[in-house]
């Protein structure tokens, strides 16, 4: 079951991927975005991941302390991003 946080983060990722103008195949995947969706399937590279992280930081008023190389190895799918943000928000609460 998708909770509010996961739904919001999926929305942030969809907006970023759509604004980057992926191809038709990527658009189909974006329409069916779930926690299991791999970032590479969305056409997200390390720069795109940095943009997504920035978008999430702005949306939640948090700072994600990791360099792009660490993020790229740790955050492989949408669920990984949701889990990382959930952990940061829980710490801050």
UniProtKB/Swiss-Prot annotation:
Domain Carrier: 4-89
Protein's recorded name: Nodulation protein F
Biological role stated in the UniProt entry: Proposed to synthesize nod factor fatty acyl chain. Involved in trans-2,trans-4,trans-6,cis-11-octadecatetraenoic acid biosynthesis.
InterPro entries: ACP-like_sf (IPR036736), PP-bd_ACP (IPR009081), Ppantetheine_attach_site (IPR006162)
Gene symbol of the encoding locus: nodF
Residues with O-(pantetheine 4'-phosphoryl)serine modification: 46
Post-translational modification: 4'-phosphopantetheine is transferred from CoA to a specific serine of apo-NodF.
Entry keywords, A to Z: Nodulation, Phosphopantetheine, Phosphoprotein, Plasmid
Domain of life of the native organism: Bacteria
């Amino acid at each position: 079951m998708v909770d509010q946080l996961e739904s919001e983060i999926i929305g942030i990722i969809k907006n970023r991927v759509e604004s980057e103008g992926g191809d038709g195949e990527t658009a189909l995947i974006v329409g069916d975005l779930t926690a299991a969706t791999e970032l590479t399937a969305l056409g997200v590279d390390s720069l795109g991941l940095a943009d997504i992280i920035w978008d999430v930081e702005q949306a939640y008023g948090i700072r994600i302390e990791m360099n792009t190389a660490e993020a790229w190895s740790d955050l492989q799918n949408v669920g990984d991003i949701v889990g990382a943000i959930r952990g940061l928000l829980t710490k801050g609460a």
